From Swiss-Prot:
Family statement: Belongs to the class-I aminoacyl-tRNA synthetase family.
Location of this chain's protein in the cell: Cytoplasm
GO cellular component: cytoplasm
Membrane-spanning segments: none
Protein name (record): Arginine--tRNA ligase
HAMAP family: Arg_tRNA_synth
Organism: Psychrobacter cryohalolentis (strain ATCC BAA-1226 / DSM 17306 / VKM B-2378 / K5)
Subunit structure: Monomer.
GO terms of molecular function: arginine-tRNA ligase activity; ATP binding
Entry EC no(s): 6.1.1.19
Record bears the keyword Protein biosynthesis: yes
Keywords in alphabetical order: Aminoacyl-tRNA synthetase, ATP-binding, Cytoplasm, Ligase, Nucleotide-binding, Protein biosynthesis
PANTHER family: ARGININE--TRNA LIGASE, CYTOPLASMIC (PTHR11956:SF5), ARGINYL-TRNA SYNTHETASE (PTHR11956)
Gene name as annotated: argS
Amino acid sequence: MSQAQIDTLTSLFDSAIAVLKNDGELPADWQNNSQITRTKDTSHGDFASNIALTAAKAAKANPRQVAEKIVNALPENQDIRQIEIAGPGFINVFLNTEAKFAVLDDIFNLQNGFGLSKQFDGQKIQVEFVSANPTSSLHVGHGRGAAFGMSVSNLLEAIGYDVTREYYVNDAGRQMDILATSTYLRYLETNGETVTFPVNGYQGDYVSDIAQTLKTQHADTYVHRFADIAENVPEDAQFEINADGEKVLLSGDKEAHIDGLIANSKALLGNGYELFLNAALSSILADIKDDLNDFGVSYECWFSERSIDSEIEPVLQILEDKGYLYEKDGNIWFKSTDFGDEKDRVVRRANGQSTYFASDIAYHKNKFDRGFDKVVNVWGADHHGYVPRVKAALLALGIDADRLDVVLVQFVALWRGDEKVQMSSRSGKFVTLRELRHEVGNDAARFYYVARKPEVHVDFDLELAKSQSKDNLVYYIQYAHARVCRVLEKLETSGLSVDDAIGAAQQELLVAPSEEELIKLLAAYPATLMRSATGYEPHILTNYLKELAALFHGWYDSNRILPVSLTSGETPSADEMAMMQARLRLSKAVRQVISNGLGLLGLSAPSSM
């Protein structure tokens, strides 16, 4: 059943419900939230509806009795061969032969547009994803957010949304100061100063590379003695490794130490401090942009945290005017518990500095001020406690919190054999997204990042992702596409060609159970795409493509598409030619849908493998 036919069937049931309401069998305000689903067993029809079960309570009747009334009220339709009531009250719909093949017509007519919808046409939605601190290269954990966010954005566009992809650049705050100071200390080293590098500094080689560039550009212009920078700074943390291999703090305070170095660096450098901050920021941000672009991830907007500095105080004033702020222990608190949060939150510290949460309130207000109907935040799972406070702030500002959806993406564990690779951006020892892509390829990375529900951890098997076997789902799905391309190449070599008109005229020859299953699964693609998009669940699409590829491979291995006579130099019979064109039509339809689905996930559809 094509999407148009699904819409028609939905309309038929709506008409029947209208009759029941008019006859007083159902309340006039009853809302139809039933589903039309593809049946797994063809003996149960092509599609089934649970509408009678959902209406039974409102109708105050047995579901089977309600089903009988609905069936009797259904308008006639030429595509429907038979309707049966099954089990507790399911309504099974059997299509006639011609209607079953309508999906093939849709696929060939719409091609790349098959499955797309305009249901949400005109609605603006923003998807913010990755938004990693610009303090180091992206690691493999960030890659999952990138693949997920881009796939979700593509899916939302496919159902009609006007999508804005956004990266929130955290270019303000303490982490940037740690980066700037780390860069400055490495700059001193390149100029011959002996530096005791802080435990809490960013220690990767990329910081030294940035510092070397600054030395080339500015020589020793900004050099100060390290002794002056470390003057009166609290002792850094000192650790030892105990008998169990655990790191144990002996003395010192790494946070107080780095804060002291930051303060002294700012005082000694004056305006020059911004040079180091901006140089590090621009270098790392450029690297992030290049990395994501190479990964097939792009954005309409790179939004700077600094750009909303001027919006923080006005938004806090709004909350104060509404009576949602109060002072306690010198801090200014937001009454987030009034809106369901577990505790109130500080928005301005006693020293007068606003908190990161205050900045986030201003940022989210800014999002809705820009006219988005809906906003989707793709966050790491460690941000789960942050969701209630952000929604509380929206409610306090008079913004419908349901317009914000937050998807929490779990972490990625990367395995090399039996060894689990650990990551730490400050130590400089982490596996980057770029390294992963170079090892397994973009397609494998993009697929396995989204192949599971976002709330489920991913154990990324490098060896599996590189293998050429049916166990590697990326290879398995892409190979189905390549197989069809190979068949068409063989056909061309034999001097024959695909005749779509003959294929369409002979498609009723496709009566084998495996062929009927393939056609039914192709018909399910539009609904699958819609469900995957509206639920922000690209794994639904990956599972569909896996099922489609498996059905195709099984059918391909059991049935000849090209007649044996072609390889022996004989002329195929008329019956063989008719079946060949029908099966070529089905094969091309499978290829088209696989290509469409892979494209939405950001994967290639190779013609040979």
